């Protein structure tokens, strides 16, 4: 049931050729006869190699790359006893290494060879399932600590030795999280780490001391590179640091005190859940710092009482797991799917969180040690214990076999014949520990893919049963639809006359019935011709009566019906979304309420059904994050993603934007947010995403080219200025982003630390191009934002990124008046504090430069008239809120003119970039009256509020000419006063 024999034989012949080439004195042509003789005898080294290469392409690759290792395996099959003493053996190899290049190669060669040995042991069943993931974890720990210790010595030579205020030498302590912490690592797991050190202080023994945090941050960066960087020898481990305090925005290394303060004051329940697995790697039990670190973390993880307060958080986590299974259709994912590894881990960790404070036996990291303890406490039955144990070991066997094939982090069942055969062969018989930790043979009735899948599903069903019973949900809102007039809506024999009767009963007027019946009949016809499966049809049959009952109970049923039917048609073949609406009545009600009031929301949900998930929590829906919470929410959203999957990362950014936009729109529609706050939220959302996009672009560009040599530490030397509505903190639902990219002045120089060296100027152009590419990339979730760069110096003819000096020179000497008007509505939206201050000084200097007031009036007036002529030709009976005279554009021009006219006398008048505060400051300084300022602000917010409302309805910003007549009249008076008197 593995690779066809001729293919294996050909692979062995190629390996034999390799041996003869590298070791002609030890191997000759007789080796080919040995292949013929022993290929079918798994007890011989050649037969064992046959089995190993048939099960793993990764093993084949390592044997080809490492001839000495191949020679060893040809003479003697690796055994589990050979997969031991990792730290000691690695230490010997690292002892003579003097350069980082040597460190990188040694780590990777050691890792690959030892992983290949474990894969061989796994393929030959010479190690149990448990022994494999324990050894994988021990190997990872040895590599991490070996690299840390080597780099620590080098760092001390470079920057001095870190000490505390009493002169005690400080070391970097590393918490291994997740499967690494629980001695449960997979073949191709990434590793989750947290760096910490005992106390603040500074280095000694260096001409230029640095503080401990800087030392350990630099050391941590070097360690991550040593483990994570991909070289010609591969990588050691994909390294994820996002579980540290404050995530990506937090310091890379924190002192013990800072760690304790964070977890006591800000630690969240999901961080408690994650920290259960946290284990100090390479811990010396005689080290007092090890004891201190454990003591400061324990109260955060384990409460001294039975912690029922966490149950709601666990319910939320459980709901998220269930929704993700539904939403993503994770049928063949053995980790994340229903009844998968994650659910077993969740079951165990629930009991640890709730009872671990009182039950010391639950304060462990290893799942297999915890299961019997949970049974002893009568928290699960003996049968449930066995069901979970056997399922876990079977699933972990499948997972490790899958990942050992190509050294890739996957939990998806294969679709190709070869890899299915490998799984069948690996799972019909293998070894695991008995109750006394002795190997025992496990056999399953697996002989083809169907029987494998049947065994897998049996395990998953047992896990799901325990998972579902663990934290119950009382669905008190479950509706009884037996009396629902729409119960038979999808029955083929329901006639139009009967539908008309139902509509009449529900108050639909006679003149509207034909139109509505036509829509309903078209929907029924569409459904009858769609292939949606048995389960899909069952769910739809239950859902439609509930949906129609609520639609026709709403006064806006005529508008609502086509919107809701469109959504249902879009999700018709995706049963998971139909189930979500059926099983969550509140979500259905919420969706109907929002779609009745917003075409935009209805369109977004129809295009991106993943947004339905946001409807499950009304409280969260009506309360968008506070402005400072946006980065943390986005980080939390991205945590579940593999760090090296850029496409998935970019798609997730778009999904986060859509989900948050939905929350803002919902709060707007339902009156929870005033118009000014809506724009604030939309602006801060855009800025949060912009920060993430720039950082992602920076990572991608620096991974290839390194970074400009003039930069220090974590500097980027790069600033993004927001113009227009972004600059004015006035974004709307459909606004694009007007951006200008600026960089440090670079007289010469190039990049360092990358695979390819380029000129520093070219680096920033590449960075700008990458940012634009990420924003505009079309994925299944749409694009992120439309980006407009035409306001940069020289417009479309200018470079995508220019220096601050070039920007200032252009604005001072070449910019037109309209470009200075645009500068009024600009502000720094990304960049280091020093660069933001620099931009603001340049901006203020330009806006406060002396200018001819008469010419300024002429320029502003002519530009407005030119714009009006360009947009003329519309219906005279309509008022375009944005473009027509007396509208938004006039108010914006008034604000810009006031700044340009009066900032030369008082530069403080140029401080604000938003119209409302510009009018406030002008009134404060007597430029306009308080009454004029209030009226201008009221006109502006009223017009913007109407535009927001029309956006939500999916309509253009056009109303009848009678609307806003007073506002238009007042704006015209101000315009005449400023530009014609």
Curated annotation (Swiss-Prot):
GO cellular component, one term: cytosol
Organism annotation: Mannheimia succiniciproducens (strain KCTC 0769BP / MBEL55E)
Keyword line: ATP-binding, Magnesium, Multifunctional enzyme, Nucleotide-binding, Nucleotidyltransferase, Transferase
Record-listed E.C. numbers: 2.7.7.89, 2.7.7.42
Superkingdom of source: Bacteria
Names of the cofactor(s): Mg(2+)
Name listed for the protein in its UniProt record: Bifunctional glutamine synthetase adenylyltransferase/adenylyl-removing enzyme
Family: Belongs to the GlnE family.
């Amino acid at each position: 049931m593995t690779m066809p024999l001729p293919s294996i034989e050909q692979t062995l012949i190629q390996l034999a050729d390799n041996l003869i080439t590298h070791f002609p004195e030890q191997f000759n042509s007789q080796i080919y006869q040995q292949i013929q003789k022993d290929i079918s005898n798994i007890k011989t080294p050649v037969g064992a190699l046959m089995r190993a290469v048939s099960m793993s392409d990764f093993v084949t690759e390592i044997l080809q790359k490492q001839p000495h290792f191949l020679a060893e395996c040809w003479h003697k099959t690796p055994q589990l006893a050979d997969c031991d003493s990792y730290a000691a053996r690695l230490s010997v190899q690292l002892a003579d290494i003097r350069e980082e290049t040597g460190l990188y190669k040694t780590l990777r060669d050691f890792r690959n060879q030892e992983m290949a040995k474990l894969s061989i042991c796994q393929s030959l069943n010479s190690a149990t399932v448990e022994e494999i993931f324990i050894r994988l974890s021990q190997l990872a720990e040895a590599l991490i600590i070996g690299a840390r210790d080597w780099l620590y010595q080098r760092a001390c030579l470079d920057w001095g030795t870190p000490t505390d205020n009493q002169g005690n030498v400080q070391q970097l302590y590393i918490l291994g999280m997740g499967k690494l912490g629980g001695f449960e690592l997979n073949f191709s797991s990434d590793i989750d780490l947290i760096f910490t050190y005992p106390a603040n202080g500074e280095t000694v023994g260096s001409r230029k001391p640095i503080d401990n945090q800087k030392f350990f941050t630099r050391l941590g960066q070097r360690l991550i590179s040593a483990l994570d960087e991909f070289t010609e020898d591969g990588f050691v481990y994909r390294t994820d640091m996002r579980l540290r305090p404050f995530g990506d925005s937090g310091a890379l290394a924190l002192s013990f005190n800072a760690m304790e303060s964070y977890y006591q004051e800000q630690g969240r329940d999901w961080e408690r859940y994650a920290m259960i697995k946290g284990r100090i790697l390479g811990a010396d039990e005689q080290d007092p710092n090890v004891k201190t670190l454990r003591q400061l973390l324990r109260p955060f993880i384990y409460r001294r009482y039975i912690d029922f307060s966490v149950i709601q958080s666990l319910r939320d986590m459980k709901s998220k797991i269930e929704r993700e299974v539904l939403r993503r259709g994770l049928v063949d994912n053995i980790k994340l799917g229903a009844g998968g590894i994650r659910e077993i881990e969740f079951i165990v960790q629930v009991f640890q969180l709730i009872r671990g404070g009182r039950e010391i036996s639950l304060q462990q990291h290893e799942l297999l040690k915890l299961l019997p303890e949970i049974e002893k406490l009568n928290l699960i039955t003996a049968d449930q214990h066995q069901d979970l144990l056997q399922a876990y070991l079977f699933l972990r066997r499948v997972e490790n076999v899958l990942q050992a094939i190509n050294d890739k982090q996957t939990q998806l069942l294969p679709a190709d014949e070869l890899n299915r055969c490998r799984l069948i062969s690996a799972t019909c018989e293998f070894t695991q520990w008995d109750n006394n930790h002795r190997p025992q043979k496990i056999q399953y009735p697996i002989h083809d893919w169907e029987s494998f899948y049947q065994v897998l599903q049996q395990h998953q069903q047992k896990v799901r049963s325990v998972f579902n019973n663990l934290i119950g949900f009382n669905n008190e809102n479950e509706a009884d639809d037996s009396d629902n007039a729409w119960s038979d809506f999808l029955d083929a024999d329901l006639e139009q006359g009967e539908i008309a009767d139902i509509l009449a009963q529900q108050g639909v007027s006679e003149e509207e019935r034909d139109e509505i019946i036509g829509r309903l009949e078209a929907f029924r016809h569409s459904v009858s011709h769609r292939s949606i499966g048995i389960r899909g049809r069952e769910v739809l049959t239950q859902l439609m009566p509930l949906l129609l009952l609520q639609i026709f109970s709403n006064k806006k049923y005529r508008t609502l019906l086509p919107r809701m039917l469109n959504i249902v048609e879009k999700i018709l073949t995706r049963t998971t979304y139909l189930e979500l609406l059926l099983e969550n009545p509140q979500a259905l009600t919420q969706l109907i309420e929002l779609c009745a009031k917003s075409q935009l929301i209805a369109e977004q949900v129809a295009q991106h059904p993943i947004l339905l998930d946001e409807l499950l929590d009304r409280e969260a829906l009506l309360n968008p994050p506070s402005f400072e919470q946006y980065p943390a929410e986005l980080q939390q959203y991205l945590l579940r993603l593999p760090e090296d999957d850029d496409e998935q990362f970019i798609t997730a950014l778009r999904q986060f934007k859509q989900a948050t936009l939905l929350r803002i729109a919902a709060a707007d529609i339902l009156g929870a947010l005033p118009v000014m706050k809506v724009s604030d939220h939309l602006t801060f959302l855009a800025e949060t995403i912009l920060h993430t996009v720039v950082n992602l672009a920076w990572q991608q560009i620096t991974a290839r080219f390194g970074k400009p040599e003039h930069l220090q530490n974590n500097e980027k030397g790069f600033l993004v200025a927001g113009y227009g509505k972004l600059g004015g903190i006035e974004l709307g639902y459909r606004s694009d982003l007007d951006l200008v990219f600026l960089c440090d002045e670079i007289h010469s120089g190039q990049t360092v630390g990358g695979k390819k060296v380029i000129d520093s100027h070219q680096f920033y152009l590449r960075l700008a191009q990458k940012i634009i590419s990420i924003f505009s990339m079309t994925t299944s979730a749409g694009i992120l934002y439309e980006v407009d760069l035409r306001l940069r110096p020289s417009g479309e003819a200018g470079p995508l990124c220019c220096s601050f000096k070039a920007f200032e020179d252009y604005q001072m000497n070449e910019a037109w008046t309209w470009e200075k008007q645009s500068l009024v509505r600009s502000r720094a939206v990304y960049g280091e504090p020093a660069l933001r201050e620099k931009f603001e000084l340049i901006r203020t200097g330009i806006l406060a430069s002396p200018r001819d007031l008469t010419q300024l009036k002429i320029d502003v007036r002519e530009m407005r008239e030119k714009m009006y002529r360009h947009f003329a030709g519309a219906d005279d009976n309509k008022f375009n809120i944005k473009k027509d005279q007396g509208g938004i554009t006039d108010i914006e021009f008034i604000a810009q003119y006031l700044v340009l006219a009066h900032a030369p006398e008082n530069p403080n008048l140029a401080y604000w970039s938003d119209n409302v505060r510009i009018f406030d400051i002008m009134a404060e300084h007597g430029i306009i009256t308080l009454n004029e300022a209030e009226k201008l602000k009221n006109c502006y917010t009223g017009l913007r509020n109407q535009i927001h409302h029309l956006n939500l309805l999916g309509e253009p910003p056009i109303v009848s000419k009678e609307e806003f007549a007073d506002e238009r009249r007042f704006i015209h008076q101000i315009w005449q006063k400023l530009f014609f008197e």
